[in-house]
UniProtKB/Swiss-Prot annotation:
Residues 7-79 form the Sm domain. This is Small nuclear ribonucleoprotein SmD3b. Disruption phenotype: Pleiotropic phenotypes of delayed flowering time and seed production, reduced root growth, partially defective leaf venation, abnormal numbers of trichome branches and changed numbers of floral organs. The double mutants smd3-a and smd3-b display embryonic lethality. Keywords: Cytoplasm, mRNA processing, mRNA splicing, Nucleus, Ribonucleoprotein, RNA-binding, Spliceosome. It is found in: Cytoplasm, Cytosol; Nucleus. Disulfide bonds: none annotated. GO terms for biological process: developmental growth; mRNA splicing, via spliceosome; spliceosomal snRNP assembly. It comes from Arabidopsis thaliana.
Length: 131
């Protein structure tokens, strides 16, 4: 998984192999085992219980759902304990395991101090006051 993916998309990838419920914008419901889900929410489900808008229920073997037609998905509660949330908690608490250099004040830690203020006092600096 890429670092640029948002949490909902990562959670969707974690839901592969679990039973999910997908409601489409048209009002139709699909409940089945998620085989695969793409970043754009395109999903493959198998062993589906399909509920039409009028309430009629039928069984389907295999379905591919276009992501732009999805209103929302219901995923299992067990995914609350997914490893990605543990990494997220660590990052929030300041115990980040990221490899990059931070962008805050501590980013220049260990570098020689440049003195107070900006710059080194070269050309364009304010001259000292003579007395």
């Amino acid at each position: 998984m890429s670092r640029s993916l948002g949490i909902p998309v990562k959670l969707l990838h974690e839901a592969s192999g679990h039973i999910v419920t997908v409601e489409l914008k048209s009002g139709e419901l699909y409940r089945g085992s998620m085989i695969e889900c793409e970043d754009n929410w395109n999903c493959q489900l198998e062993d589906i219980t399909y509920t039409a808008k009028d309430g009629k229920v039928s069984q389907l073997e295999h379905v591919f759902i276009r992501g732009s037609k999805v209103r929302f998905m219901v995923i299992p509660d067990i995914l609350k304990h997914a490893p990605m949330f543990k990494r997220l908690d660590a990052r929030i608490k300041g115990k980040s395991s990221s490899l990059g250099v931070g962008r805050g004040r501590g980013a220049m830690r260990g570098k020689p101090a440049a003195g107070p203020g900006r710059g080194t006092g070269g050309r364009g600096a304010v001259p000292p006051v003579r007395r």
